[in-house]
Amino acid sequence: MNSVLISLSVTAAFFVVAAVLGFRLGRSPKPYPKLLLSVHALMFFAIAYGIGACLDKLSKTATDASITKVVLLVALGLLWANLVSGIVMICLKKKNRGWILAHKLVMFAMAISFVAAGVFMAMKW
């Protein structure tokens, strides 16, 4: 179970990097800087790989961590919703506050999912 917590911690670190880069992108004028945008998009793949690694390690452990798996699957679904809102924001000509708010709310919900997964893993649920 310790290796799962390490994987979740690394994934959370990638999540923090993505949030910081997103904050910088939010302060940038359109068109967005290509380097920041590409690194921010690459963080999507790092986070998706990290969630997949956590789910894979959970499936190999002997403990029944069904609640943790559900929370990680919710985080994965939120990650896909975040990708869609990010692509829409890139395609729009002007900054749209509604899409920015949706992107931030999904990121916040994903952060709550990561914290909940860590708590449930620590409690071995």
Per-region residue spans from a language model:
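Membrane-embedded alpha-helical bundles that constitute the cytochrome b-like, heme-associated redox core
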Residues: 1-125
